[in-house]
Amino acid sequence: VVLASSLTESQAHFFGEEYAGLEEVGAIFGAKGDFNREAVAASGAQIVIDVGDTKKGMAEDLDALQEQLGIPCVHISSNLATYGDCYRALGELLGVEERANEIADYCDAAYKEISDVMETIPVEERVDVLYLSGEDGLSCVANSSYQANVVDMVSDNIAVVDDPSGKSNQTNMEQIISWDPEFIIFAPLSAYDLAGTDAAWQTLTAIEGGNYCEVPSEPYNWLNGPPSVNQVLGMQWLPRVLYPEKFDDDMYETVAAYYKTLYQYDLSEDEFNEITARAVPVVDQK
């Protein structure tokens, strides 16, 4: 087994040290595109599996890679609605159907729960949201982009731009003020701290009212970093922030169930509180 990217120390804490030393061979697709064919060939890998958004030309690229490496190269399409199918396919490919079905059933149940809740909230009553990233907070995760799957599903993502990019779109404070969202989500290492003190940010309805938070990021960003199965956790977290009246369960129990099912990790309440310290709207922290 080799990895597209190596694990950080904090990620290895959740996955286990046996995964920390696996070789990094880079990503086939995406912004990096740093796939190391020689390292894969030397590793003795028996199959290459790419999971994610299906893009034009991907099949041809994988066919060429398969010819070069002499081993099967497979792409499995995935999104919020199909993570269950994705894991079932992985289970069949790798001969671990029982474990894959456990995760698949969890993903399907989570998607159904949130879909059912969102059906009770008319589109016009959904919270106007901006999801901002970048050190200065001036990049937005645009409506209808692959990275915005969760935000689009559970809110009115008002970051409508002419040409949504794969990850984020550059914007400016004037545009953000014009959008004036009801709620702002900041990516990790973005402008969460700045927003609490900067005069320009304070002119926004969401910031003035304390209706903003930061996405948890352990072991991965819960919304889109990367846009993978961690989105299932974000899909359960974000609507509980935006529409708490629609849920009567305990957020810790919900998050702990995800960690147990996906990572086989027993998340303590202290760890949960640390991970989600900024995931609660500022107005509710006071």
Q: Where are the model-predicted features located?
A:
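A short, structured surface patch at a secondary-structure boundary
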Residues: 1-43, 47-56, 157-159
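Short, structured coil segments at secondary-structure junctions
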Residues: 43, 68-69, 154-155, 207-208
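Extracytoplasmic substrate-binding proteins
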Residues: 60-139, 161, 168, 216-279, ...
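Short acidic active-site motifs
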Residues: 35-36, 61, 171-175
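Structural recognition of the beta-strand scaffold that forms the well-ordered cores
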Residues: 1-5, 47-51, 72-77, 127-133, ...
